[in-house]
Amino acid sequence: MKTYVSEFPMEVSIPNYEKVNFGCAVAELRLRPKAEVDDEWMALSSILGDKDIDVCTFKGREDTRLVQVLNDMGFKFISTFYTLSLDRTDFMETTHENIALRVEEATDADIERVYDIERGVFDYSTYQMDDRLSADKMSERNVRRVASYVGKPNNHIFLIKRDSAILGFIQFLYDDDIAHAVNGAIVRSLQDQFVGSLMYSGAFKSIFNTGITTITSGVSAQNIRALRIHQACGFKIIDAEIHLRWIRK
């Protein structure tokens, strides 16, 4: 973790600071919800002054004054992201007549195929990046992010399969009685063919059968397909935040 402290009595943490290996550094920034705009401006100025950082992502509550400050500093809006939550008692299972599809937890032998799926479906256009952050480069960054959880005891990856073919995956981190969905993807050719709905529903059912009581997930407001899948299973939107990104010129 890399931490910056401004002149004001507030601390800014970057939990996912990563110097990626394609000539660019990425800092994902999250500020305290009740921080004053002037505090945030000072903290951001300190971060953007770090010559090791070429890209900075701001995540936080939407605030007109703060957004104007960020725009003046060169940040551009990416998307609104929703936090969704599902309690076990509200879960609605999705069913389909295609019994050839099944959901099961991944083994070590499946991980390379999971990486291949992540590479194949990455859509960099939602990130509004320049040439330094191409689709291939950002795809590899996402693969490394998926891989960083593998091997940890609270990491669980569920797959949807047809026979031996892996068609998609969804990854969770368990925290006591809560499971957090951190990533998921379906092979591009099978999107809009009910595969995603069955995978998510099957994974949620398996998780709740372990004693987990709540599942949380984050979805971009632009990803209408994913929102519909979550809401069909009973998820409710409980929070929203905006993501803006700055790129060093």
Predicted regions and their residues:
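Conserved acetyl-CoA binding element of GNAT-fold acetyltransferases
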Residues: V20-A35, Y82, D177-R188
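Acyl-donor-binding surface of acyltransferase catalytic domains
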Residues: R32-L101, E105-A109, E241-W246
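Conserved acetyl-CoA-binding loop-helix of GNAT-fold acetyltransferases
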Residues: E36-S46, N183-I186, D192-I207, R228-A232
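A short helix-loop-beta-strand connector motif used in the catalytic cores of GNAT acetyltransferases and
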Residues: D52-I53, A147-F158, H180
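Conserved beta-strand-loop-alpha-helix junction that forms the acyl-donor binding cleft
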Residues: T57-L66, V187, S217-L227, R245-R248
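A short beta-loop-alpha structural element at the N-terminal edge
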Residues: R102-E118, F122-S125
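Conserved beta-hairpin
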Residues: N154-I170
